[in-house]
Amino acid sequence: DALTPLTTRVLEAADRAKRTLDAGVTSIRDIGGTPRGFKLAAQRGLFPSPRMNIAVSIISQTGGHGDYALPSGITHPWMAAMLGYQTEWPNSVGDGIEGVTRVARETFRAGADFLKICTTGGLSLPDEDPNHTQFIVEEIKAMVAEAKAHGSYVAAHAQGLQGIKNALEGGVRSIEHGYFMDEEVADQMVAQGTYLVPTAHLTNGRLRRKAEDPASLPEDVIARSNTVADNLKMAYEKGVTIAMGTDVGVAEHGTNAEDLTALVDLTGMSPMQAIVAATRTASECNRKDHEFGTLTVGKLADLLIVDGDPLADISMLENKAHLLMIMQGGNAHKDLINS
């Protein structure tokens, strides 16, 4: 919150990074919020952490999903503390070709490895609607062009149908969420080679909760969750390339393996296919497959040794007690085998 000193927030973030590594996640793509200095500290080994690729900020149009200025004129407490440190988190709100190009360049200057933009509203705030489109196609194309100029790419928060279409027309590399896509969009994603990161744990959790207690959630929430689940299964069956990813702020840090279970439950993936979505495919999405993502000679030695069979029960990976060894870059972060 806005009353917490920045130094406290940094130490809290370091603890969250350790929890994520403790869960067996050796590399992450942080899609908004992590500044370059934090990544540098992790690289220097100042605290245990997954290696990071970072977007630094979430780029938004004025009044969009990543604009935290409230109608009252007050900045939302989520971001108020951050926005006082403009050298770490540059302005991330832009409009028009010139405006978004400048924001993109400033974001790369601040240390971003890629750009995260919002082409729709979201579901987390009462005044948002995922069906509202954000950024026109020409603005999206301008940011994609700027990313390409930096040898990078754009990931798009996109939930509603038209905003997903706009993001695809603009040339983004990955669609984050993609909840309300249709078959035409799925076909286009296959044709363009666009990745889908469905952040499926929330939907799966809601449907499980409904099965256990039918009265626990409103009917409109269940109906929406069923639609999202149906669309994800459709996308998988049509051959959309799916990379596993979580949604921080909705999921606790260190619970990443819940998304593996969700992919198996919602799409019909085998446990091995879900593991591939979290390793090889995720590294390809992040353009890091030459460094990690598979057990290949010459790549970084990241591996887990577990005391069970995740191919028989993928959910076992949610329990950290089952992780006997976590190796990151050839170094054992956790080793219960030789200790």
Where are these regions (language model features)?
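Aromatic/hydrophobic pocket-lining residues that form the small-molecule binding cavity
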Residues: A13, V100, I136, I140, ...
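Metal-coordinating catalytic core of metallo-dependent amide/deamination hydrolases
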Residues: Q43-S216
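Metal-associated gating/positioning segment near the N- to mid-region
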Residues: D1-R44, G63-L70, E138, Q162, ...
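Hydrophobic residues within beta-strands of alpha/beta enzymes
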Residues: G24, I28-R29, L115, I175, ...
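C-terminal cap of metal-dependent C-N hydrolases
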Residues: A278-R280, V297-S339
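A short acidic, glycine-rich active-site loop
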Residues: D1-E12, P90-N91, S216-T227
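His/Asp/Glu-enriched, well-ordered alpha-helical/loop segment
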Residues: A149, Y153, D213-S216, R224-P310
